[in-house]
């Protein structure tokens, strides 16, 4: 099979928020020792979670699973005000690994509600980021998942309305929902800057750039990763078969039969070591060479909590 090629999307994999969240857990373990409790998977990637668990992190879904006097870390997806209050009441030592770009949305929600506006949250029901963002206020916030949902929205005052979005949505889907909102509520207020984060946008753009040149696309990421699922959808919407795989073992050789150009990308919570393993497996199956595609360089970094900045 001559001239087979593996196309590597750029950028791909870890974003600044994920790197920060993982480092918070690792530094807390170094500084305070195991166990360190983490509310929800710190990022949605099985490999990362299993690795941190092996180092002494204990993942829980609710704070009542954390013994009094222990340390708890909030995941990158953010938490509601009720969770913060519960941690405070319990006297737990808290490190907040919420992505700063999610925190930005939390601040927007609080500010808009203080101005007396009702809010529309564009996002996926049940996703922890959505639950955390909607839980910034006690009432006056509605969830919309599709443009069709907009028609059923019941609001008190159409002129006192604002919207925010989950940070990991499909850029195109979110734009369609915003268009529907503006058509129905012309005076709706949006965020000064789009809530969909730079990493989500860049990774989706990289897949759009890659798909015209690819016969099949592999997205390295876990099934519960919102941004990874969106990358798969972006490829599929452009008529290219796409598969979400946790690792190299998830690849079915039948998927690349007759495919000369194989695209590879990774979600924002997928480590590069898994991408490397996927590439090696694809090379072994297809005899393909690897070509790195051009993309937007990312130089974003987020500071760690002060108490953990010195921990090594």
Swiss-Prot record:
Any Pfam family the entry gives = LYTB
Give the record's pathway.
Isoprenoid biosynthesis; dimethylallyl diphosphate biosynthesis; dimethylallyl diphosphate from (2E)-4-hydroxy-3-methylbutenyl diphosphate: step 1/1; Isoprenoid biosynthesis; isopentenyl diphosphate biosynthesis via DXP pathway; isopentenyl diphosphate from 1-deoxy-D-xylulose 5-phosphate: step 6/6
Q: Which CDD domains match?
A: lytB_ispH
Q: Keyword Ligase on this protein?
A: no
Cofactor(s) needed for function: [4Fe-4S] cluster
Question: Which transformation does this protein catalyse, written as a reaction?
Answer: isopentenyl diphosphate + 2 oxidized [2Fe-2S]-[ferredoxin] + H2O = (2E)-4-hydroxy-3-methylbut-2-enyl diphosphate + 2 reduced [2Fe-2S]-[ferredoxin] + 2 H(+); dimethylallyl diphosphate + 2 oxidized [2Fe-2S]-[ferredoxin] + H2O = (2E)-4-hydroxy-3-methylbut-2-enyl diphosphate + 2 reduced [2Fe-2S]-[ferredoxin] + 2 H(+)
Which residues are [4Fe-4S] cluster-binding?
A: 15, 99, 197
Which residues take part in binding (2E)-4-hydroxy-3-methylbut-2-enyl diphosphate? 44, 77, 127, 167, 225-227, 269
Active site as annotated: 129
Record key words, sorted: 4Fe-4S, Iron, Iron-sulfur, Isoprene biosynthesis, Metal-binding, Oxidoreductase
Provide the E.C. number(s) assigned to this enzyme.
1.17.7.4
Write out the GO MF terms.
4 iron, 4 sulfur cluster binding; 4-hydroxy-3-methylbut-2-enyl diphosphate reductase activity; metal ion binding
Q: How is the cofactor bound?
A: Binds 1 [4Fe-4S] cluster per subunit.
Question: NCBIfam families attached here?
Answer: ispH_lytB, PRK01045.1-2, PRK01045.1-4
Name the protein family: Belongs to the IspH family.
Protein's UniProt name: 4-hydroxy-3-methylbut-2-enyl diphosphate reductase
Q: Which gene encodes it?
A: ispH
């Amino acid at each position: 099979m001559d001239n087979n090629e593996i196309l590597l999307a750029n950028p791909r994999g870890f974003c600044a928020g994920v790197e920060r969240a993982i480092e918070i857990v690792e530094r807390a373990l170094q500084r305070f020792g195991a166990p360190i409790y983490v509310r929800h998977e710190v990022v949605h990637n099985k490999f990362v979670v299993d690795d941190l668990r092996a180092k002494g992190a204990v993942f829980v879904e609710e704070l009542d699973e954390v013994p009094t006097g222990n340390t708890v870390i909030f995941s990158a997806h953010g938490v509601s005000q009720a969770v913060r209050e519960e941690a405070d009441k319990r006297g737990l030592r808290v490190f907040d690994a919420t992505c700063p770009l999610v925190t930005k949305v939390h601040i927007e929600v609080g500010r808009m509600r203080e101005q007396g506006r009702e809010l529309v949250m564009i996002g996926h029901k049940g996703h922890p980021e959505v639950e955390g963002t909607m839980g910034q206020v006690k009432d006056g916030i509605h969830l919309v998942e599709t443009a069709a949902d907009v028609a059923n929205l019941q609001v008190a005052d159409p002129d006192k309305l604002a919207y925010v979005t989950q940070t990991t949505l499909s850029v195109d889907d979110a734009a369609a929902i915003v268009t529907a909102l503006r058509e129905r509520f012309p005076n709706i207020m949006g965020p000064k800057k789009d809530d969909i984060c730079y990493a989500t946008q860049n990774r989706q753009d990289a897949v759009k750039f890659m798909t015209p040149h690819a016969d099949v696309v592999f997205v390295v990421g876990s099934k519960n990763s919102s941004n990874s699922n969106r990358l798969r959808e972006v490829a599929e919407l452009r008529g290219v078969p796409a598969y979400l795989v946790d690792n190299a073992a998830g690849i079915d050789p039948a998927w690349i039969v007759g495919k000369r150009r194989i695209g590879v990308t990774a979600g924002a919570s997928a480590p590069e070591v898994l991408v490397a393993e996927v590439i090696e497996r694809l090379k072994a199956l297809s005899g393909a060479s690897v070509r790195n595609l051009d993309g937007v360089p990312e130089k974003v970094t987020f500071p760690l909590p002060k108490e953990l900045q010195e921990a090594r």
